[in-house]
């Protein structure tokens, strides 16, 4: 079991480092003439992406096409640096009992979603319960399998979809507790996964519409999604965390062929691409 735990932690850190490395690359760069007021809006970077295969909902994503924009649109309890080291983002503190079966989580005050509504403890507990609930058929459901009551939310035919995980208890607007069904010492790392992002009340009123126009609390906010072409994010001026954008926005350009993206990198019409296609390395 300890070996499994270590393996999970390594995977968690690898995932975090990869997501963060990309996020840092984006938030750290911008065009050199971006300081000029005459060029307002030119300090926007373009990044390679594939078309998301699912709605832009944190708990319903399992591929990079959706994962990249979601990482920038949503702040979680913790964030990671390029080495995979965690630091608090929305969390004020995350404390576990001695056997790591209960966590007490306090969140910072003053955080808001881009629709102006506050980020509260319930923004997390309702989001996590929604994702865990089989009735809602979310791809990230299994991330919540160690939370008490998860098994009771797995028979979708008997559920309405709004049932809450019994292991989550809201203490007040800025504190909640998490009771687990078994010891999980890496839970405090897992809460940095995109699936653990908070959701505003508007999500629960119309999840389908939200998936096309997500409302987050991250360093960027959603502007538009032209399917199979591009996703446009702009800097969120109200973001209060440790991943502040150093540019005015990110435009994810959708490609079906890496070679086309690489050609755009070479011509200067694309700023960021994580890997070079094999054809470009042939001599």
Give, region by region, the residue ranges found by the protein language model.
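Ligand-site clamp/hinge motif
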Residues: 205-208, 237-282
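Sec-dependent bacterial lipoprotein signal peptides
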Residues: 3-26
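Short, well-ordered beta-strand elements
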Residues: 41-54, 92, 102-105, 124-127, ...
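N-terminal lobe/hinge region of extracytoplasmic solute-binding protein
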Residues: 48-98, 215
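Gly/Pro-rich hinge or "lid" segments in bacterial periplasmic/extracellular proteins
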Residues: 174, 179-245, 249
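Bacterial lipoprotein signal-peptidase II cleavage site
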Residues: 26-38
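Surface-exposed binding/hinge segments that line
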Residues: 106, 123-125, 132, 136-200
């Amino acid at each position: 079991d300890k070996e499994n735990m270590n393996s999970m932690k390594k995977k968690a850190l690898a995932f975090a480092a990869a997501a963060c490395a990309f996020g840092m690359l984006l938030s750290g760069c911008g065009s050199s003439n971006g300081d000029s007021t005459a060029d307002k809006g030119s300090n926007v970077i373009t990044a390679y992406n594939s078309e998301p295969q699912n709605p832009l909902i944190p708990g319903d994503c399992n591929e990079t096409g959706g994962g990249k924009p979601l990482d920038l649109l949503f702040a979680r309890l913790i964030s990671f640096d390029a080495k995979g080291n965690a630091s608090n983002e929305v969390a004020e503190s995350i404390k576990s009992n001695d056997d790591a079966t209960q966590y007490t989580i306090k969140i910072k005050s003053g955080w808001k979603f881009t629709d102006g509504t506050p980020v509260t403890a319930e923004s997390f507990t309702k989001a996590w319960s929604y994702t865990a609930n089989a009735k809602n058929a979310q791809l990230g459901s299994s991330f919540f399998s160690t939370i008490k009551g998860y098994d009771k939310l797995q028979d979708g035919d008997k559920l309405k979809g709004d049932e809450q995980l019994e292991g989550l208890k809201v203490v007040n607007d800025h504190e909640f507790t998490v009771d687990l069904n078994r010891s999980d010492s890496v839970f405090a790392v897992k809460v940095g996964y995109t699936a653990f992002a908070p959701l505003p009340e508007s999500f629960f009123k119309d999840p389908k519409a939200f998936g096309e126009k997500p409302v987050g609390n991250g360093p960027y906010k959603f502007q538009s999604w032209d399917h199979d072409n591009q996703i446009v994010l702009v800097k969120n001026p109200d973001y209060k965390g440790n991943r502040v954008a150093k540019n005015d926005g990110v435009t994810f350009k959708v490609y079906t062929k890496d070679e086309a993206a690489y050609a755009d990198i070479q011509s200067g019409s694309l700023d960021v691409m994580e890997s070079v296609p094999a054809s470009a390395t042939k001599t």
